[in-house]
Amino acid sequence: TKPGEDVQKVQPTPTPAPQPTPEPVSRRGTAEPIPESVRASMQGKSMKTNSNITYDDLRYLTIPHYDFNYNVVTGHLVVADDVAEEVLDIFAELFDAKYPIERMELIDKYNADDFTSIEYNNTSAFNYRVVSTGSGKLSNHAYGRAIDINPQQNPYVYRNGTGAHENAREFWQRDVSKWSREIDRAAYIGNET
């Protein structure tokens, strides 16, 4: 415009402030060969010298899950290579259902001591060990083909109705209506819920 001309004042249209886009949470975890650093932490603990299974037979899983406060956290498992994708599918379904898992750490954090891992209600899989019956037979955990999920709420119960872990006593009886915390009922795997 030239000086002296009537200029129509235009009010700028305010631009809305950008809204943060939440990062989408991938519901499905990932599988990879066992990293060297993880191998080093497993050696002599969950991976003992043996002729049955090697690191190449296993996969390291990184899995998103809900904790007992319903926060999304990341856990890790080691499982057999040939079941890794199926395990990831199952945990994706558990994620979609908002199934809570208290913790999911490699058992090596507990020096590969199954009893201690269970005391901390740790969800774990691979641990080269024998079954607890005294038979000397290798456990399915020794092949990465068994997973203990929330072992406090889902304890191993002896035929006489008791278990080895006092912190799981409330859960030896499978009547979930008598359990004191809602999160415990949510973390149980069974048909009663």
Place the predicted regions along the sequence by residue.
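Compositionally biased intrinsically disordered regions enriched in Thr/Gly
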Residues: 23-66, 71-76, 138-139
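Generic alpha-helical secondary structure signal
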Residues: 36-37, 81, 85-88, 186-189
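Active-site-adjacent loop/helix surface patches within enzyme catalytic domains
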Residues: 100-145, 151-156
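Intrinsically disordered, low-complexity Ser/Thr- and Pro-rich stretches
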Residues: 8-10, 16, 152, 157
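Active-site acidic/histidine clusters and adjacent loop/turn architecture
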Residues: 54-118
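Catalytic cores and adjacent binding grooves of peptidoglycan-active enzymes
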Residues: 131-138, 143-193
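Ser/Thr-rich, Proline-interspersed low-complexity disordered segments
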Residues: 4, 11-23
